[in-house]
């Protein structure tokens, strides 16, 4: 037996075959990798008895006829041109009616290129019947076409300003009657056209200025209260109580009374006092110097008391109204000449607001405030 084994091993390759069988084969040296990278590994085909072998293992668990049928159905549905499902939101069942919120505009199909085929953006929704029959869907204002706006929308609103109502002589009602004449005088200063009623009142204004100057201006004499005011100021600066004040005290007295004379005015005043009055001023000279200044200051200051005094000068019989004859007589005294009857009637007509032919105190105040 030993000889048989030895004879068997004498065959070429028997020893290497035996080593492979026993697992003691020599190790192979690692082969060098090619430049293109590792070669793909070859997988040995499975043995004939393996479970994955055969055509049945290559297909899925679904039968081949069923998979082909489902694919054909999907391709036919895509080729039929059916509506795609929306990308956003759930799919809507075509059998259900679409719901619309009250007041919203329904969708309209796109119009063709013909302008005559265009329709309004929205039409009033019909009244719903059934369970919702009591509810009426009203269209919103923005859904109405522009041509359907009512004609009342073009009318002015009640809050829009209306032209002021004008009364007699072109005066605005509810305003002072003096404003109409003042506006006409401003228009004349700008060169605008002046109404005829305002131009007729101009002669009255020219006659009124001398009256105001005589009653309240510098042409009048000092009132007793004004003389008493000057006397108190003179006594305050008469230090030695001899009835005279010097030039320096006169300047201080003027500043105390509210007059601010310049240095040049004080020099001229002192020269006049030294030359004509011996360097001292008594009360009469003081009134002569300060009277015109006091009258010039109060010339434009007309109060209610002064207006009542002037009204009494016109109202000679004291009945509270100025008649045509009283106005003619007062103007004759103030102006120094007789005024014609026609001119007096024009003055009364311009001043008389209630049209009774006479002038009361209220109308007189409005006349004087022009």
Swiss-Prot record:
Protein's gene: CABP1
Modification after translation: Phosphorylated. The phosphorylation regulates the activity.
CC terms in the record's Gene Ontology section: cell cortex; cytoplasm; cytoskeleton; extracellular space; Golgi membrane; perinuclear region of cytoplasm; plasma membrane; postsynaptic density
Membrane topology label: Lipid-anchor
Species name: Homo sapiens
Gene3D superfamilies in UniProt: EF-hand (1.10.238.10)
Gene Ontology terms, MF aspect: calcium channel regulator activity; calcium ion binding; calcium-dependent protein binding; enzyme inhibitor activity; nuclear localization sequence binding
Chain ranges of the EF-hand domain: 225-260, 279-296, 302-337, 339-370
Domain of life per record: Eukaryota
Binding site for Ca(2+) 1: 238, 240, 242, 244, 249
Localization, UniProt: Cytoplasm, Cytoskeleton; Cytoplasm, Perinuclear region; Cell membrane; Golgi apparatus
Covalent lipid sites (N-myristoyl glycine): 2
Low complexity biased stretches: 50-61, 68-84, 148-157
Residues noted as binding Mg(2+) in the record, renumbered to the chain: 238, 240, 242, 244
Domain notes: EF-1 binds magnesium constitutively under physiological conditions, EF-3 and EF-4 bind calcium cooperatively and EF-2 binds neither calcium nor magnesium.
Sites bearing Phosphoserine, chain numbering: 323
Positions of region (Disordered): 1-198
GO biological process, any: visual perception
Coiled coil: none
Subunit organization: Homodimer; when bound to calcium or magnesium. Interacts (via C-terminus) with ITPR1, ITPR2 and ITPR3. This binding is calcium dependent and the interaction correlates with calcium concentration. An additional calcium-independent interaction with the N-terminus of ITPR1 results in a decreased InsP(3) binding to the receptor. Interacts with CACNA1A (via C-terminal CDB motif) in the pre- and postsynaptic membranes. Interacts with CACNA1C (via C-terminal C and IQ motifs).
Protein name: Calcium-binding protein 1
Effect of residue 323 to A: Loss of phosphorylation and loss of calcium release by InsP(3)
Tissues where this protein is expressed: Retina and brain. Somatodendritic compartment of neurons. Calbrain was found exclusively in brain where it is abundant in the hippocampus, habenular area in the epithalamus and in the cerebellum.
One Pfam family recorded for the sequence: EF-hand_7
Keywords attached to this entry: Calcium, Cell membrane, Cytoplasm, Cytoskeleton, Golgi apparatus, Lipoprotein, Magnesium, Membrane, Metal-binding, Myristate, Phosphoprotein, Repeat, Sensory transduction, Synapse, Vision
